[in-house]
């Protein structure tokens, strides 16, 4: 750890404390993520080390680079590239008012990063505004990709805050174990809606409340809209029945093409959800000037 000198604590993330630090040799500013391990006595599981090592190979302009992994007996520290702020802070500072070209640019970059990881068979599983980082050039990069697989997603964060369910796909909320890349598309759709409307689309306070909020907006799913729903562990025949609302009446700030893309991302049936690669070709992005 002598290679890095801490500058300040940036916060407490899902997995541990995050520090801003400086590489003593190069002067480069980095973010150090201290991973808290539940099994203090057992040290770092080798499966986690394997998973993390693979993440060093994920090199893409819209993915936060993992520079280094420092593994001591009881601690694991991940050294990431440093970015100025996350999308949550950005949204708070704008008072939820993001310009339409910025929404389009951020969404395109988010989907580029997701598509790249999905091509490399890496899921995120916990996409939310807090782990989308932005720099002063308007570049957006995804943080924490692949960490869920290495360490699992805890119910509570390092600082005992409850990990948010607002961006969690309904198949996961209903106990699906067979999930794949579509779970990240659902989360990206929720983030898209939040950027456009200035507020979270489904701000639930627990698993049931989360599901019911989704039902109230998108309508309660059934076997017609979602053929395999009855096979899910948490499916109940007595779910409250709600009709579907037009997304345009809830998410203001998106044009027709944007709403069309959003509806394709927020499909109940994971098999019907648009892929990241297909989303990037959607007419909503026509005429976009890419940053990278």
Swiss-Prot record:
Example GO BP: vesicle-mediated transport
UniProt-recorded name of the protein: Cyclin-dependent kinase 5 homolog
Modified residues (Phosphotyrosine): 15
PANTHER family the UniProt entry points to: CELL DIVISION PROTEIN KINASE (PTHR24056), CYCLIN-DEPENDENT KINASE 5 (PTHR24056:SF46)
Occurrences of domain Protein kinase (ranges): 4-285
Binding residue positions for ATP: 10-18, 33
Record EC number: 2.7.11.22
Regulation: Phosphorylation at Thr-14 or Tyr-15 inactivates the enzyme.
Residue positions, PTM Phosphothreonine: 14
Family indicated by similarity: Belongs to the protein kinase superfamily. CMGC Ser/Thr protein kinase family. CDC2/CDKX subfamily.
UniProt source species: Dictyostelium discoideum
Catalysis performed (reactions): L-seryl-[protein] + ATP = O-phospho-L-seryl-[protein] + ADP + H(+); L-threonyl-[protein] + ATP = O-phospho-L-threonyl-[protein] + ADP + H(+)
Keywords per UniProt: ATP-binding, Kinase, Nucleotide-binding, Phosphoprotein, Serine/threonine-protein kinase, Transferase
GO molecular function: ATP binding; calmodulin binding; cyclin-dependent protein serine/threonine kinase activity; protein serine kinase activity
Active site residues of this protein: 126
GO cellular component, one term: nucleus
